[in-house]
C-alpha cells in the first residue's frame, strides 16, 4: 500500500517564490503550439522572462545562455524534435537546467522513443501526469492523449524509480501532486478541478518548474514550490470564477499578485 508523503511546507514555498521573483529567470520554452501564449503569460505573471526560440541553430545558441530550458513534446514533429535535440545538448554542455514534459508518452511511438532518447542528457526535472510518468518509467499506464486515467499516488513508485534511473527530480501531478528525487517524497495539495478544464495549466506548470530549477539551493524543494504556487493560484482563482472563461484571467491575476506573505 502506498502511504502519502508529508505535505509541503508553505514557509518553504514562500521562500522559493521570493527567490524566484527576485531572480526573474529567463526560461527558454520549446513547447507545444497550443499553449505558447498561455505559458508565456504565466511566466510573466511570476516575474520570469519567457522566450520561444524554435529554429534549431538559434535554439542551441539560446539554451546555452538562458537560465532554464523547457522541452514539451505536445505537438512534436520531426523538425521540432531536431530543435529540441540541439537545445538540450547545448543546455547540457552549458550546465543549463532543463525540464522534460513528456506529453502523451506511452500512447504514441515517436514521442515515446524521442523522450527516452532525451533522458541521456539528464534533465533537472521531469513533470507529467501519472500515465506519462508510468509510461516513461516503462510501466503500463492508462493514458488517453494528454489525460490520465491513473492516480498520481499510484504512480509515485514509478516516479521514484524513474528519478533514480535518470538521476533527476520527478513531479507527478494530479489531484495531489508528488515530487520525488527517488529518496525523498513531497506531497502538494490544492488546485481545483477547473484547472483540468482549460488548456495549458500543466504545460505552464512545467515551464514554471524549469524556472524554479534555475534557483540556488534545494532543487527538490524548489520543484515542490513551483507546484505549490500554481496549485494555490488555481484554487484561489477558481473560488472567484463562474466558469472556465473567467478562470484564466483570474488565474493570471492571482499569480501576478501572489506574494510570499500570502503563503507563509
From Swiss-Prot:
According to UniProt, the reaction catalysed is: 5-(2-hydroxyethyl)-4-methylthiazole + ATP = 4-methyl-5-(2-phosphooxyethyl)-thiazole + ADP + H(+)
Q: Which CDD domains match?
A: THZ_kinase (cd01170)
According to its UniProt record, this protein's enzyme class is transferase
The residues that hold substrate are: 52, 200
- Which coenzyme or cofactor does it need? Mg(2+)
Annotated keywords: ATP-binding, Kinase, Magnesium, Metal-binding, Nucleotide-binding, Thiamine biosynthesis, Transferase
List of residues binding ATP:
127, 173
Out of the domains of life, which is the source?
Bacteria
Which terms does the UniProt entry file under GO BP?
thiamine biosynthetic process; thiamine diphosphate biosynthetic process
SS bond list: none
Q: Which residues form the signal peptide?
A: none
Q: Per its UniProt record, what InterPro entries does this chain match?
A: Hyethyz_kinase, Ribokinase-like
Annotated EC: 2.7.1.50
Pathway listed for it? Cofactor biosynthesis; thiamine diphosphate biosynthesis; 4-methyl-5-(2-phosphoethyl)-thiazole from 5-(2-hydroxyethyl)-4-methylthiazole: step 1/1
Gene Ontology MF: a single term: magnesium ion binding
Q: Say yes or no: keyword RNA-binding present.
A: no
**Primary role:** Catalyzes the phosphorylation of the hydroxyl group of 4-methyl-5-beta-hydroxyethylthiazole (THZ).
Q: Which NCBIfam families match?
A: PRK09355.1 (NF006830), thiM (TIGR00694)
- Please state which protein family the record places this protein in: Belongs to the Thz kinase family.
Q: What is the protein name given in its UniProt record?
A: Hydroxyethylthiazole kinase
Q: State the organism named in the record.
A: Pectobacterium carotovorum subsp. carotovorum (strain PC1)
Q: What is the lineage of its organism?
A: Bacteria, Pseudomonadati, Pseudomonadota, Gammaproteobacteria, Enterobacterales
Q: Which gene encodes it?
A: thiM
Amino acid at each position: 500500500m502506498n502511504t502519502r508523503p508529508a505535505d509541503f511546507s508553505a514557509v518553504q514555498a514562500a521562500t522559493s517564490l521570493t527567490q524566484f521573483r527576485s531572480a526573474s529567470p529567463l526560461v527558454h520554452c520549446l513547447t507545444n503550439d497550443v499553449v505558447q501564449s498561455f505559458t508565456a503569460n504565466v511566466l510573466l505573471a511570476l516575474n520570469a522572462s519567457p522566450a520561444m526560440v524554435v529554429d534549431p541553430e538559434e535554439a542551441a545558441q539560446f539554451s546555452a545562455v538562458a537560465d532554464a530550458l523547457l522541452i514539451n513534446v505536445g505537438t512534436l514533429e520531426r523538425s521540432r524534435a531536431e530543435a529540441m535535440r540541439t537545445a538540450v545538448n547545448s543546455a547540457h554542455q552549458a550546465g543549463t537546467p532543463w525540464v522534460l514534459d513528456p506529453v502523451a508518452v506511452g500512447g504514441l511511438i515517436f514521442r515515446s522513443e524521442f523522450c527516452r532518447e532525451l533522458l541521456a542528457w539528464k534533465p533537472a526535472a521531469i513533470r507529467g501526469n501519472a500515465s506519462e510518468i508510468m509510461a516513461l518509467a516503462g510501466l503500463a499506464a492508462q493514458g488517453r492523449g494528454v489525460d490520465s486515467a491513473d492516480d498520481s499516488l499510484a504512480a509515485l513508485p514509478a516516479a521514484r524509480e524513474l528519478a533514480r534511473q535518470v538521476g533527476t527530480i520527478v513531479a507527478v501531478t494530479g489531484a495531489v501532486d508528488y515530487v520525488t528525487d527517488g529518496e525523498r517524497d513531497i506531497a502538494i495539495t490544492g488546485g481545483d478541478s477547473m484547472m483540468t478544464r482549460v488548456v495549458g495549466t500543466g504545460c505552464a506548470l512545467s515551464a514554471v518548474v524549469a524556472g524554479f530549477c534555475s534557483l540556488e539551493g534545494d532543487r527538490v524543494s524548489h520543484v515542490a514550490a513551483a507546484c505549490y504556487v500554481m496549485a494555490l493560484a488555481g484554487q484561489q482563482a477558481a473560488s472567484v470564477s463562474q466558469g472556465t472563461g473567467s478562470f484564466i484571467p483570474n488565474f493570471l491575476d492571482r499569480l501576478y499578485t501572489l506574494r510570499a506573505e500570502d503563503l507563509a
